[in-house]
Amino acid sequence: MTPRSALIDPFSLDGQVAVVTGGTGRLGSQYARALLSAGAAVALFDVATPGPIVRELLDSDALMSSHLVDTTDRAAVDRAMDEVVTRFGAPTILINNAGLASSPADAGLATARFEHYPATAWDAMMESHLKSALLVSQAFLVTFRAAKRDAGSIINVSSTYGVVSPDQSMYERQRLGGQEWFKPVGYSVAKSGMLNFTRWLAEYCAHERLGVRVNTLVPGGVREDGHSPEFVAEYEKRTPLGRMAREDDYNGAVVFLASQASAYMTGAMLVVDGGWTAR
């Protein structure tokens, strides 16, 4: 049954419970704030401990919790999911946001030329993005079924580089002191994989009559301190809206996909990229 609050305000998440993987990072924590502001209780799953900003939010809001968990380990995911159920009840919203931008274990080689891209970096990308989404989605659905919930939403986070290939000439502006720097192939392939994972899982959940919708959020590039001024200028020149994204540019999209406002939407992708992929 649709909650009364959703009939009055289709964007309301009152009474809902959300899990956000990669939840202590810049975007993950922002997605969590958006869900909190709409009324949901939110559990953060991450291999990293919360930084000062997230810790302050955790200390001030009883509807948020943080769980130190390797989302590529099913047993660890199950334990964390049990903790969420004990504290808030069975989750109804899942944001699969975990994933590496490049493999820190391979340092410079992870952004080197394709011919020298390490297989270990490739494996790390597939594990952190796709295996994580697989395992956490499995645990989410097990819990969802057991609680006999009737309406839920899974949001898989992809990237514009899962839709179009990066223009490597832009990344010449990120190369310092002659260092080679290419946007890694593993990142693009993993983010592309999230799109078809969404379509497959959306059809499966519909076939099983679970009431769980599955969609992909496709965000554009967010400005970071590590971006060179030349890179930012080039990116913004190529973006129809003329700027890189801020973290809060995705608040509305996240709440929309999580809520009954998108009740007739599944297996789709919502692109929020300032027009980057329109060209």
Model segments located where?
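Amphipathic alpha-helical dimer-interface segment in Rossmann-like NAD(P)H-dependent oxidoreductases
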Residues: 99, 127-149, 161-165, 202-207, ...
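Conserved glycine-rich Rossmann-like NAD(P)H-binding loop of the short-chain dehydrogenase/reductase
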Residues: 38-54
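Short C-terminal tail/terminal secondary-structure segment
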Residues: 2-9, 101, 111, 237, ...
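Catalytic Tyr-X3-Lys loop
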Residues: 92, 100, 114-134, 155, ...
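Substrate-binding pocket helix/loop in short-chain dehydrogenase/reductase
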Residues: 105-123, 168, 235
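Canonical Rossmann dinucleotide-binding motif of NAD(H)/NADP(H)-dependent dehydrogenases/reductases
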Residues: 10-43, 201
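Catalytic loop of short-chain dehydrogenase/reductase
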Residues: 117-119, 150, 155-207, 221
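Short, small/polar-rich loop/turn modules that mediate ligand/substrate recognition or access, typified
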Residues: 94, 151, 206-213, 265-267
